[in-house]
Amino acid sequence: MIYPQNFEQKIGFDQIRQLLKEKCLSTLGEERVMDMAFSDHFGEVEERLDQVTEFVRILQEEDNFPAQYFFDVRPSLKRIRVEGMYLDEQELFDLRRSLETIRDIVRFLQKSDDDEEEGASPYPCLKRLAGDITVFPQLIAKINGILSPYGKIKDNASTELARIRRELASTMGSISRSLNSILRNAQSEGVVDKDVTPTMRDGRLVIPVAPALKRKIRGIVHDESASGKTVFIEPAEVVEANNRIRELEGDERREIIRILTDFSNQLRPSISDVLLSYEFLAEIDFIRAKALFAEQISGLKPALENKQLLDWTMAVHPLLQLSLAKHGKKVVPLDIELNEKQRILIISGPNAGGKSVCLKTVGLLQYMLQSGLLIPMHERSHAGIFSSIFIDIGDEQSIEDDLSTYSSHLMNMKIMMKSCNERSLILIDEFGGGTEPQIGGAIAEAVLKRFNQKQTFGVITTHYQNLKHFAEDHEGVVNGAMLYDRHLMQALFQLQIGNPGSSFAVEIARKIGLPEDVIADASEIVGSEYINADKYLQDIVRDKRYWEGKRQTIRQREKHMEETIERYQTEIEDLQKSRKEILRKAKEEVEQLMQEANARIENTIRSI
């Protein structure tokens, strides 16, 4: 279950669809993009991801993948199911080229890797996809008998067509010779200019003449130029021949239609099978578009597990990444973990600190993953499968139902509590907001308690202290903070799991220049204990960030030392192998020299 109906618009997946459509080669792939759907079947999701991963390798490692002629001829094929209908010349040309593309793709995917065991494929998932696809070599051969390499009907497509075109060529030649003779005489008499040549008007060969001299040439006036300075005369001597040309052209058209109709009649029983092959072409176009998009966003397949899990390292919101890249900026990556011990993450921190972006990143990437798209994160990341995803973000105000923002929020909570389970992922922004804080916080805590009891997974953003305390006191729920630099007074857009975040309300108020006496009054109203607790919280987060940085530095140094030690050990092993090899070869050479010396001594003794 995906909730609400406009879930894709809320997380930005509609924009992902549009970006994918732009990478398709044809309407075949574009339809697949629009039909792309979320799946909660582990095997299906893994197969889709593996297909895209393999195609990324094709894009990176191969330069001969057949991707030239992705034509959607399905409407034409469906049209000729009706008796008497036929494919025209262009449709037949598109059919041939796209059938050749299907054939070439199947051959490409079914090839074996010479470096591996016999029959093994470098692209096993795509090979399975191409396994039962019919490639219609006889159909292609028939079309080749009709069309030239450039898509024109061949002269020898039929005996009758060859005869018609021979007569056409002969008649045209005769007319041309007659016209040239008439033209030379007219030029010698000064009726037409020296540089004038015969031209075509309404399919008939004519001579351009000045209006004042048109009576000098006996014939039929067919047309005049837009300026009125030229008329086009068909000499009487070639009228009959031109009429014959028109007759032959009609015969040619009728014979071509007969040839195309005959071919379409032969094709008609196989149309259903041919259409199945075009479904394969559509799938390849779709997978290729997903692979191109994966390259654009540095997407990959994390280690996929058949359970509910988020263990992401350096995850990135792809739309934000593309947007910032245009301005030469980079996204701050997200590290997040949800598992059986910490299923629900409560994120707190200052406004505009990245809480909502964090929540949307989780929703978008998980939805992309289960829709068969590779996602941008570190390769050591792990991901699971959820049966349903719910989101509550933004203003869902309905004029028709006269619902306020908070009423809409509560309606969403009601649906989530009713429908969620241990395989669900819930995403809630500003949990409990939109009403009086005390009761809003209480209701939010009660709802959170139900979510936890149902063992659902989720990411929730909030400012409420009671929800932070709930996370500290209950198993399955964990706090997270969006980090903030107190000295620079700016958000760092980094998520740190383990401690709640501060809203930094006092610091932000002081930064924007609120009078100190107002800040002092506010501090007195809320109480020194709250202010001190918030400061202690900030100190804890700051210290944790400091020690986390130290830990990262130590880890990097340890990794560097391990790599150095491993490199030296490898070099020592290589030296030992080289030493043994040198000694072995030296021993063999000594033995060979001894054998040769003994042989020479024996030969010398025999000769004496």
Model-identified regions with their sequence ranges:
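Long, charged, glycine-rich C-terminal linkers/tails
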Residues: 183-201, 291-314, 378, 478
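ATPase nucleotide-binding head domains, primarily ABC-like/P-loop NTPase cores
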Residues: 297, 305-541
